[in-house]
């Protein structure tokens, strides 16, 4: 099916699909167990399914060909999904929710700030965070909650890579990121946007967490605005536009990009690492091969670089398989 045919099917709602409940459609079923709902729906109706989510209509596609056309070939046909509006209270006008000229400008600056050379410079930060956590595990010898540990690891690594190795996120910062991630996930599957404006406990917790993180980020931006230090992501964002002869990002724009990187990066990475540890615990043969490869690599003198880490081919293959089986971004919307 071509991009035009997918778009036409969407507008005519001719694809098969479940009817759902009056007014609510299939939203309650999808919210209860999204993955099970999608698996059962596609098994019954095929690769292209029409759904009604409250007042909204949606088309779900799973075939590789149709997904490729929607995500890559259909840029002019399929713009940003209305669902991305749900991210704006958290990330403002960041790269993820930008379009047109604003997106191109922000993307160019983000590419400059996240170039291979820039990522290479952050590896020492990532290694330091991992070594600290490994030291804690060796000292305690207690069972570990992998999901909690990987969340804490990724937020810590993200925080230091953005603002410098000397900064450590306290428990309140970790709690605030967890609160924002949880509430954004809940809102993403809500079909009643007005609920987000009610004074519920979840909405109040989200607003309080966002306000505290906003104050912290703006303070860090203000403290660094006149510096030329580009050793972390904040410094690179401050310098990237200047290096390309463009107007510098405003404090608000830098704030939005920091939240975009933070919220998009920490949860997906933590999820992947958590599933990786489950694979290591479940597949003993795989775990032994990973351990042997890493041990041999380390004994030869570990090369903490993109090229050096690339020599861990079996470990990379295991991570790729974890991503295939347990994709952290398992639903994309246009």
Regions found by a protein language model. Give the residues of each.
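Structural preference for long, well-ordered alpha-helical segments in enzyme cores
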Residues: 70, 130, 154, 217, ...
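Short, hydrophobic/aliphatic alpha-helical segments
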Residues: 3-12, 246-262
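Conserved cytochrome P450 K-helix E-x-x-R motif and the immediately C-terminal K′/meander segment
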Residues: 26-46, 219, 302-334
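Short Gly/aromatic-enriched secondary-structure transition segments
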Residues: 70-76
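Proline-centered turn/helix-capping motifs that create local helix->coil transitions or kinks
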Residues: 166-167, 182-190, 221-232, 285, ...
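Cytochrome P450 catalytic-domain helical core, especially the substrate-recognition surface
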Residues: 15-43, 54-57, 64-68, 82-163, ...
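Cytochrome P450 catalytic-core helices
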Residues: 154, 268-293
């Amino acid at each position: 099916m071509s991009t035009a045919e997918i778009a036409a099917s969407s507008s005519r709602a001719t694809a098969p699909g479940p009817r759902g409940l009056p007014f609510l459609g299939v939203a309650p079923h999808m919210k209860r167990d999204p993955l099970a709902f999608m698996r059962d729906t596609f098994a019954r109706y095929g690769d292209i399914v029409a759904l009604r989510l409250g007042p909204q209509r949606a088309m779900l596609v799973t075939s590789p060909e149709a997904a490729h056309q929607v995500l890559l070939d259909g840029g002019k046909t399929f713009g940003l999904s209305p669902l991305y509006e749900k991210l704006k209270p958290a990330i403002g006008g960041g790269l993820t929710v930008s379009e047109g000229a604003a997106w191109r400008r922000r993307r160019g600056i983000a590419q400059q700030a996240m170039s291979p050379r820039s990522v290479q410079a952050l590896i020492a930060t990532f290694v330091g965070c991992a070594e600290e956590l490994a030291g804690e595990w060796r000292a305690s010898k207690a069972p570990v909650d992998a999901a909690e540990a990987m969340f804490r690891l990724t937020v810590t690594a993200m925080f230091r890579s953005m603002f410098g190795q000397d900064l450590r996120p306290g428990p309140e910062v970790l709690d605030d990121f967890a609160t924002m991630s949880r509430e954004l996930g809940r809102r993403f599957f809500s079909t009643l946007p007005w609920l987000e404006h009610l004074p519920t406990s979840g909405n109040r917790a989200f607003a309080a967490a966002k306000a505290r993180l906003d104050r912290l980020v703006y303070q860090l931006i203000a403290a660094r605005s006149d510096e030329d230090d580009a050793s972390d992501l904040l410094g690179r964002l401050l310098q990237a536009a200047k290096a390309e002869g463009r107007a510098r990002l405003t404090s608000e724009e830098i704030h939005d990009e920091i939240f975009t990187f933070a919220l998009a990066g920490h949860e997906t990475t933590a999820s992947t690492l958590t599933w990786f540890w489950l694979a290591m615990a479940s597949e003993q043969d795989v775990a032994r091969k990973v351990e042997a490869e890493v041990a041999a690599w380390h004994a030869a003198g570990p090369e903490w670089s993109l090229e050096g880490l690339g020599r861990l081919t079996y470990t990379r293959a295991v991570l790729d398989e974890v991503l295939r089986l347990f994709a952290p971004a398992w639903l994309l919307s246009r």
